[in-house]
Regions:
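Acidic, proline/glycine-rich low-complexity IDRs
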Residues: 160-194
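A surface-exposed partner-binding patch
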Residues: 1-129, 181, 192-194
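Intrinsically disordered, low-complexity regulatory segments enriched in Ser/Thr/Pro
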Residues: 142-153
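Glycine-centered tight beta-turn/hairpin loop motif at sheet-sheet or coil-to-beta transitions
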Residues: 129-131, 153
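Beta-sheet entry/capping signal
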Residues: 121, 133, 145-146
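Short, surface-exposed beta-strand/loop micro-motifs that present aromatic residues
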Residues: 132-139
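Acidic surface patches and DE-rich sequence motifs
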Residues: 127, 139, 150
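Local beta-strand/beta-hairpin segments that build beta-sheet-rich folds
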Residues: 124, 157-159
Length: 194
């Protein structure tokens, strides 16, 4: 379940290489783990998830948040899994962004404004220096699905599960970053773990 992520974390010298036409620069990266979340905090997460996911609790039993693909020259350029203690504040901040949409509706994979199941959603990941966030629906028709909030458009369902989300992230980090991160890594062409 966490094997692709653990493989990523074990990379001895992770780096991106920019496209040749952009100079071919190497961007040294780091993947940062933290001490495990407390049993009480993980139990609270499990309660919030309402049985919609088992991957996040397993992950937080190993590390209370993660920083992945962090630029060694500027660690704020990164993808992160939030520490459990920050999830409520990030959800409140994302709610303010969702309120800026003029409509509240769902259209296939797209969600505009505040979804009807928002109260039970869990905001768990995002990018440094950007308002983009990832959240999990824990109730309703999208229960267990992962959504990506893009502050210039709407929220989009991008994975049918947290495991599927981690597969997207770990299997092709370049495509993941270029698809979802609007602040940095525009010119990357390849990812190398060593």
């Amino acid at each position: 379940m966490l094997e692709p992520l653990n493989t990523l974390l074990a990379a001895p010298n992770p780096h991106f290489v920019n496209r040749a036409e952009a100079g071919g620069d190497i961007i040294p990266l780091s993947h940062i783990t933290f001490p495990p979340a407390s049993a009480i905090a993980v139990a609270a997460l499990e309660d919030a998830l309402q049985g919609s996911d088992t991957v996040l609790p397993a992950l937080y039993r190993e590390s209370d948040g993660l920083q992945l693909f962090a630029n060694r020259a500027d660690s704020d350029e990164c993808f992160f899994l939030l520490p459990l203690a920050h999830m409520a504040a990030e959800k409140a901040a994302l709610y303010e962004w969702l309120l800026t949409d003029d409509e509240n509706c769902e259209d296939g994979d797209a969600v505009y404004g505040v979804p009807i199941w928002w109260d039970s959603a869990v905001v768990f990941a995002g990018f440094g220096q950007a308002p983009e966030r990832f959240y999990l629906a824990t109730a309703g028709a999208h229960r267990g699905k992962v959504f990506y909030f893009n502050h210039e458009e709407c929220s989009m369902r991008i994975a049918d599960s947290v495991a599927g989300f981690l597969d997207l992230l770990c299997a092709d980090p370049v495509t993941f970053m270029q698809r979802f991160y609007d602040v940095a890594y525009w010119d990357i062409a390849t990812y190398h773990p060593a």
